Amino acid sequence: LFERYAENKQDLSPDERMGFILSALRQQECCVYPFCDGGCYTCQDSCE
């Protein structure tokens, strides 16, 4: 999956491609305000 996603970004520099892959790898189930940076599925007051 990640390889196919990176292949779709072939026109990007290696650093830009790595950024896309790293952002996909760091996806979390939950982030807590104010640390929601797009790297999570839900953003809430607590993840308990």
Swiss-Prot record:
Post-translational modification: Contains 3 disulfide bonds. They are not added, since framework IV presents two different connectivities (I-V, II-III, IV-VI and I-III, II-V, IV-VI).
Keywords: Disulfide bond, Neurotoxin, Pyrrolidone carboxylic acid, Secreted, Toxin
Residue numbers bearing the Pyrrolidone carboxylic acid modification: Q27
Keyword presence, Secreted: yes
Keyword hit for Ion transport: no
Subcellular location, record wording: Secreted
Chief localization: secreted
Tissue and organ distribution: Expressed by the venom duct.
A molecular function (GO) term: toxin activity
Record-level GO cellular component terms: extracellular region
Propeptide: 1-26
Disulfide bridge map: none
Protein name as annotated: Conotoxin ArMLKMS-01
Organism per entry: Conus arenatus (Sand-dusted cone)
